[in-house]
Amino acid sequence: MSQKELWYETLHANFGQYFSVENVLYREKTEHQDLVIFENPELGRVMALDGVVQTTERDEFIYHEMMTHVPLLAHGQAKKVLIIGGGDGAMLREVSRHKNIEQITMVEIDAGVVEFCRQYLPNHSAGAYDDPRFKLVIDDGVNFVNQTTEKFDVIISDCTDPIGPGESLFTSVFYEGCARSLNEGGIFVAQNGVCFLQQDEAVNSHNKLSHYFSDVSFYQAAIPTYYGGIMTFAWATQNPALRQLDLATLQNRFAQAGLACRYYNPAIHVGSFALPQYLLDALTTIPKVIGLDSSE
């Protein structure tokens, strides 16, 4: 191990994780972020932005299947999907597996990320960038949702942590724009961190989203790369019934969609909305947490 280069993640100040580096495939500071892609013997190709791992070939399927199939199958009739972020292409890959969807718009702030990932993480997108339903917009996500006149059935915020370029995707002005950009019966979901270590993120998101959506909650999955426990995904709609679909309904929709997944299944879908008590307590007993710009 001592003879190998080690790459250390810097998300948390007092502890973290390291990766052995077999080969650095790409390293560059783009217009918005410091990007590196390297190979690890256990996880395959790994992409990190600003010192924080974003995705690995080994376990990305868990994150992307849960971020897409949960809202899309809960909706049941989605035709237009908006992805905020998602430059590695895996979110697009999973959304494009739903043949009933007519339009997929992806808004990515950094064109460099898209270019690098198409070259160095081709398995993530798996050709999805060539889908005729796909449209790429290079823009800030906050600006897009507050300027567009389009309406979407599902909005997926594949945001980084609330630092650097990703910080604006945790603000009220972004959530308000997303609520306005959804069709009736639409669903908004977003990456919301590992709640055991980043509980404030979930509490702040819940507080802000509740101003614009009548049903706000979280669902979860365990993703090895994102250490510290379960990862939470924000869920926001105007229709509580979409979060409470029975197993039989989801099984029927899953079968009709013809999906073959490695992590997602209808039972996982139902169970993912069961949250640990410490998070439920935080959401009900902490009225407001300072730290993520709750005023904007």
Curated annotation (Swiss-Prot):
Its EC number is 2.5.1.16. InterPro entries: PABS, PABS_CS, SAM-dependent_MTases_sf, Spermi_synthase, Spermidine_synt_N, Spermidine_synt_N_sf. Homodimer or homotetramer. It is an enzyme of class 2 (transferase). The active site is at D158. Catalyzes the irreversible transfer of a propylamine group from the amino donor S-adenosylmethioninamine (decarboxy-AdoMet) to putrescine (1,4-diaminobutane) to yield spermidine. Belongs to the spermidine/spermine synthase family. Keywords: Cytoplasm, Polyamine biosynthesis, Spermidine biosynthesis, Transferase. Residues 5-238 form the PABS domain. Pathway: Amine and polyamine biosynthesis; spermidine biosynthesis; spermidine from putrescine: step 1/1. The keyword Transferase applies. Pfam families: Spermine_synt_N, Spermine_synth. S-methyl-5'-thioadenosine binds at Q33, E108, D140, G141, P165. Gene3D superfamilies: Spermidine synthase, tetramerisation domain (2.30.140.10), Vaccinia Virus protein VP39 (3.40.50.150). It is found in: Cytoplasm. GO terms for biological process: spermidine biosynthetic process. Spermidine binds at H64, D88, D158, C159, T160, D161. Transmembrane segments: none annotated. This is Polyamine aminopropyltransferase. It catalyses: S-adenosyl 3-(methylsulfanyl)propylamine + putrescine = S-methyl-5'-thioadenosine + spermidine + H(+).
